[in-house]
A protein has these predicted regions:
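A short, Lys/Arg-rich alpha-helix, primarily the initiator
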Residues: 1-11
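Short alpha-helical DNA-recognition segment
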Residues: 13-32
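DNA major-groove recognition helix of helix-turn-helix/homeodomain DNA-binding modules
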Residues: 24, 43-58
Length: 62
């Protein structure tokens, strides 16, 4: 099953503020990543996937 970053975050039960608190990523950066306006580095993507408990392969890009 493919998920957007936003869907993966919501399915994991996190708000953007909680992800910010846990990772240090700015909320504006998270929004850009979730909207497809910017791409996270592979390292940042791995951090998010670990937090959301999904594999990188499960993330769908717009």
């Amino acid at each position: 099953m493919q998920l957007t970053l936003r869907a993966a975050r919501i399915n994991a039960g996190y708000t953007q503020q909680q992800v910010h608190n846990l990772t240090g990523f700015a909320r504006s950066t998270l929004t850009r990543w979730e909207n497809g306006a910017a791409m996270p580095t592979i390292g940042d993507l791995i951090i998010l996937c670990n937090l959301y408990e999904v594999s990188v392969d499960q993330i769908k890009w717009q």
